[in-house]
A protein has these predicted regions:
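C-terminal membrane-associated helical module and adjoining short loops/tails
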Residues: 1-3, 211-309
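"…together with the soluble PPM/PP2C metallo-phosphatase catalytic core" -> "…together
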Residues: 1-229
Length: 309
């Protein structure tokens, strides 16, 4: 079994090295700005590895008669990855992005069986999933955070949904981490990486919730959820445009204003999610709420102590 993962690792290295050649040739570079947390131009879009590897897994699985990963799901990944990569390399109309996101999420709703729960649940799910995908993208702001946090989330889902063959996605994340989890990153994930990851994760969490009839699985994204929602609330309080780029997430403040290393901050978020995920997997809903509440209190205490109000 490990042989396949080793082959996937080799394929991942090959894909990302080939992408570096393409990105350098076409100038797919993330240049520093007053809203970013990096100071040198860096290759963008290295996360293209995630959808490519997982789509390959999905297509080959179906070809060999294994249908847990449907071609419709692969299509959803393809659509959202394509529009996200387009956004990485060129100016994209927000309307086009929204249309493709809604279409991809509609496939998710259908394939996971959420559509059977009625219009209100479907509408709420679409809003929640699109919001989660965008939040996951916004949290991709420092070296290492997407790689390390996603290792925890995808690792948990690999354990709970072995039929989804997420171990190959986990391998792709590890390959990306080699080039990103460092003081000076070789590449960033880009929208194509973070958005595609978020879509796959959302699909799997939705599948778990439908299969088990338990809502607790949403807390597999609990730490990102806390930082995203609290930051939005504070920005609304300050009457800021929440759709404009900013650097007011706690992780951004720790990495920029406080001068902590990107990898250290990323590890804190990953470890915090790992602890919460352990409770999600092993405990009941009450246990999960208690653990989430503790995480929220700690987060708010740190924010207030740092004067982020």
């Amino acid at each position: 079994m490990l042989f396949k993962e080793i082959i996937s690792f080799g394929i991942g290295i090959l894909i990302i090295q080939l992408y570096f050649i393409v990105a350098k040739h076409f100038g797919i570079i993330d240049k520093p700005s007053d809203r970013s947390s990096h100071v040198v131009p860096t290759l963008r879009g290295g996360g293209i590895l995630f959808p490519l590897i997982y789509m390959l897994v999905g297509i080959t699985s179906v070809y060999f008669g294994y249908h847990a990963i449907s071609l419709w799901f692969v299509l959803g990944i393809f659509l959202i990855a394509t529009i996200s990569f387009w956004d990485d390399v060129a100016t994209l109309s927000p309307k086009i992005r929204v249309i493709v996101h809604v279409l991809s999420v509609a496939i998710l709703i259908w394939q996971t069986g959420i559509y059977e729960y009625g219009f209100l649940i479907v509408l709420l799910s679409i809003i929640l999933i699109i919001g989660s995908i965008n939040a996951y993208n916004f949290m991709d702001g420092i070296n290492g955070i997407t790689a390390l946090y996603s290792m925890v989330v995808v690792g948990s889902l690999t354990y709970k949904l072995p039929e989804m063959r997420l171990q190959y996605l986990l391998v792709a994340i590890i390959v990306f981490a080699i080039y990103n989890v460092r003081k000076k990153a070789v590449c960033f994930s880009g929208d194509v990486g973070s958005v595609s990851l978020a879509y796959i994760i959302a699909f799997c969490i939705a599948k778990l919730m439908v299969n088990t009839q338990e809502i607790k699985w949403i807390f597999l994204l609990g730490i990102y959820g806390i930082d995203s929602i609290v930051t939005i609330l504070y920005r609304l309080k300050r009457k800021e445009n929440i759709f404009k780029p900013h650097r007011t997430h706690l992780y951004q403040y720790l990495a920029n204003e406080k001068g902590m290393s990107h990898v250290s901050v990323s590890l804190i978020y990953a470890v915090a999610q790992a602890l919460l995920s352990y409770v999600v997997i092993t405990g009941n809903f009450v246990n999960v709420l208690i653990a989430f509440g503790i995480a929220l209190v700690i987060y708010l205490a740190v924010r207030l102590k740092l004067g982020l109000d």
